[in-house]
Regions:
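Extended hydrophobic blocks
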Residues: 1-99, 188-251
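A structural signal for short, hydrophobic/glycine-enriched beta-strand patches
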Residues: 82-241
Length: 251
């Protein structure tokens, strides 16, 4: 049974594999439009190119190559399952512990307008911020292409519009990645005289595991989290993208 399925797959790839090639190329165009040329898209491009090239190899003549590829793809599949399981553990994170600082991670703006993802992160933070008016809030995000102001300023403006006191908000407006979000925010906290801060991270549900992991690498005393819901139609793509981001964080 297993051998017959393998034969059918090989026949499909040999005769209709160009369909998969076109699907991969369409996905690449989609990713470039929405995400730009970032690590995840580069990694996907490498995988897609590898698949397209390897599909044209006669594995009956190169059995050693076939076995090697099976090992590589097996490791990839196992790592994907493990990492996605870890990501799932933090999807519904909504911790209530008292933190020394709240850190809201940026997620892109258009001009001066918040992206839907960033608005959801800010909305998710409001209950905690209002309940802890003495806890400083760091809004973290620099200014990227197509952004008229920094993400930090856009976030501060939104929180102030929601009734949060400007004095409670601290802007970190240089970061361009999750690593920089948390590293630059820690410098701000250390400058205040607090050496071992406990932080409440606010970010998207799919992004929480990686954010906590990177925060731990940056030496925070404790990392709590409030996960913001992400659009359902983008969840599969975000989860796949997060796999690549987490692999990069582990390296």
């Amino acid at each position: 049974m297993g051998r017959s399925v393998a034969v059918l797959i090989q026949k499909f790839l040999r005769e209709k594999g160009y369909i998969l090639d076109l699907i991969l190329l369409a996905c690449l165009v989609f990713f470039l439009i929405f995400w730009g040329w970032n690590f995840a898209v580069k990694f996907f491009t490498l995988l897609a190119a590898t698949f397209i090239i390897l599909r044209r190899i006669d594995y009956e003549k190169h059995i050693w190559l076939k076995r090697g590829l099976l090992v590589v793809f097996g490791i990839g599949a196992v790592s994907f399952i493990i990492i996605e399981a870890l990501v799932f553990t933090q999807l519904g994170s909504k911790e209530e512990e008292r933190a020394d600082y709240v850190i809201i991670l940026g997620s892109g703006i258009k001009g001066t307008e918040l992206s839907l993802t960033l608005k959801q992160r800010l909305d998710a933070s409001l209950d905690y911020i209002r309940t802890h008016p003495q806890t400083p809030v760091i809004v973290s995000g620099g200014q990227g292409p197509g952004e008229s102001i920094s993400e930090a300023l856009a976030m501060k403006n939104y929180l102030v519009d929601q009734g949060i006191a400007p004095a409670q908000i601290i802007m970190e407006d240089r970061s361009t990645s999750t690593q920089e979000n948390l590293a630059f925010s820690k410098k701000i906290i250390l400058a205040s005289g607090l050496e071992h801060p406990k932080i409440m991270i606010v970010t998207s549900d799919y992004h929480m595991f990686r954010s906590k992991y990177i925060a731990a690498k940056n030496g925070y005393a404790a990392e709590y989290g409030i996960s913001a819901p992400s659009p359902g139609y983008l969840k599969p793509i975000n989860m796949i993208r997060e796999y690549f981001g987490t692999v990069k964080a582990f390296l």
